[in-house]
Amino acid sequence: MKILVVDDFSTMRRIVRNLLRDLGFTNTFEADDGKTALPMLQGGSYDFLVTDWNMPGMTGIDLLKAVRADPKLVNLPVLMVTAEAKREQIILAAQTGVNGYVIKPFTAATLKEKIEKIFERIDKA
């Protein structure tokens, strides 16, 4: 499985990649914002996207909107990992089509649980 991790904070990208590796996901790539990530997604065959919300250039919610508007990417599973904990933002992400939402800080167990739930829902669909 090919996973793209998008966050403007390199330490957070590294933390997420290490947690994913510990969960058995070793084919991971990084981008530092949505502007960098979108062409990578459009040109590569990614199976999963993990993105932050607050980033310069293109925010995670704008990246999510672009992914859902692209016929080739519309079904890409997206997990948002963010400090944004306001109810309105969680609702907006859900309405925009996010598959899962994790609020920072989080544990490996939380990340694993969210990823597994996303794949359970996809398998049932």
Label every model-predicted segment.
Residues 10-29:
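Two-component/phosphorelay signaling modules centered on CheY-like receiver
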Residues 39, 61-74:
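Short amphipathic alpha-helix used as the core "switch/output" element in two-component signaling
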